[in-house]
Amino acid sequence: MVKEAVLKQYGKSIAECTDREIYDALLTSVNELAAQKESNEGKRKLYYISAEFLIGKLLSNNLINLGLYDEVKAELNAAGRSLAEIEEIEPEPSLGNGGLGRLAACFLDSIASLGLNGDGVGLNYHFGLFKQEFKDNLQYETKNPWIDKKSWLNKTDVSYKVKFGGMEVTSRMYDILVTGYNNRTNKLHLFDIETIDESIVKEGIDFDKAEIKKNLTLFLYPDDSDEAGRLLRVYQQYFMVSNAAQLILKEAKERGCKLTDLHEYVAIQINDTHPSMVIPELIRLLTAEGMSMDAAIKEVTNTCAYTNHTILAEALEKWPIAYLKKAVPQLMPIIKELDKRVRAKFDDEIVYIIDEDDRVHMAHMDIHYGYSVNGVAYLHTEILKDSELNNFYKIYPEKFNNKTNGITFRRWLLHCNAPLADFITSLIGDGYKTDATELKKLEKFVDDEKVLNELLEIKKDAKIELSNYLSETQGIELDENSIFDIQIKRLHEYKRQQMNVLYVIHKYLEIKDGKKPARPITVIFGAKAAPAYVIAKDIIHLILCMQELVNNDPEVSPYLKVVMVKNYNVTKAEKLIPACDISEQISLASKEASGTGNMKFMLNGAVTLGTLDGANVEISQFAGKENEYIFGKTADVVIEHYAKADYVSMDYYEKSDVIKDAVDFIVSDELLAIGNEENLERLYNELLNKDWFMTLLDLEEYIKVKDKAFADYEDRMSWAKKMLHNIANAGFFSSDRTIEEYNKDIWKLS
């Protein structure tokens, strides 16, 4: 295939081509092959609308799904070239931030692989979130241009007029083909405008937020610490849903829809609250077509479904009416009508769409005017029903359902850990590639020492590969015989990276005191903090200070290393996850809706160190609690602390020398000598005077359980059994299973 591709594009042999030319030729050929595959069809079509799609690099993923990966790799190897090196040329699409976007990407893969008729709809961000740089142990943000002249983006002739208050813009739709595993293709539709001006971004990621026609699709989640930034988010969200709604109605009509039967032709999944305005926008468009308000509302309610991803109040969006009047005045009469109908039916002001502060609650609109509300892990859904959305659950119990998240095994095993995938195939065949529950067959090898030793060797090889990568990219040398303890996820206080770095401080102090671990420990972090999230950036500062302090201390560094991976993204996750021994999933119980990193680590043979939060609950049920390290207060206890407002972090600090020593070290002379006093003191005071996510509540138990995990690691056969149990029981967490459940219970696509 490669020979023909480069000959067709450049008239050269493989040997005569640069890696860049080979990459460009493969991109063109793979795009053409994907376009030739039949599209998924059916009367009813799903539109998965999301502000984020963290899709990762696509070359190898598409080659795997098209059944060409082994052929291309072998052909390049025979010519003395490397597919891995060629893939390094590919920029990672910067279209997402964290779990929300990665989940959407996994879902698109599974929707296509299962042969379902469903496309993604989002925005074509030119600079994405941001590129993370470190200087003076602080995070700095720069723009992240990822769109090459040749890319997976296919410009279409589809465009729509989108009206805002006082102006109109014309969109342009770009498509990325979504290849199914040995199946048909779907599309990811990304909308943009051609008046975008990348040159308005000056220092870092600063730009004029009021220049909507120039900035609308520059960044994902523009800084919302001021009114201009918040307004820009409203403009972005409406631009996304207006295009989506126009596309949906156009395609539905082409399939024979009369609009009065829209729900028979269309299912819309609202992924978190960012696309919520699709509800009033569709009602607006349907009434403009002559439908009555009653009929339009009924049709939209039977078409839209909502996925809730969080119980954090900050993430349940509420937009001031003043913003909506300015940006999208045409929606306000409809939103007011929707709220009026809710008020006529219910006395409980908690369920109103417009609150007493004149803010529009997006989630409330989704619940009232959608036919399904789902959480993303068993515990999360139960918390929604029992407390956070209990008032709505009492009204609409039939709407609420759980869909535990999943991951695509094609990317997170076949692609990122081929040696492990090949080993599994040699043991149980390749049926697990399309039916992940077949991994359960691995359990019959749990006492086979030859298999267990091979599993340990595969893990060690992955650690060597990661060590080489970090040495080349960040100049940090790691010991592959050390324990790789990894926490990679969006930086947020509820995810408690601060607790992990307090453990690092504790271990540093122990080593300085002469108490050395039996085996060296490598603690690896990867995380970006939102530009305006001050405490999150302070936590990164502390991690970077500890990295400098620990790694340069000859007394400590042989036993402990700290690594903060710069500009963490999907590509780096693909290198980190296969090498992980201990997966850090330490969010405050009740706060993590699900998590999917926990599933990726499990599939790749890491053992979970975690709280009973999100999908950790189900992971420990499937793999067995004896094969994980569970600690911390339960969700019930945490929720009670919040209800009574009786958690005082200072109490825990004062009664424990272990906690006191670790926290005090944040403002010690050693750290202040290399860190920024303002950042460190602010974090220190936050932990002692607020600690909203209860770090100190669980810290002592975390230290004890983590030390036990490190001690247990020394029994290599016992540890390998834990690894095997995790891999064998990961099948439930395939996104194919999740999507089958969505389709059976919510979408009902043929």
PLM feature spans:
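A conserved ligand/cofactor-binding region detector
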Residues: 1-750
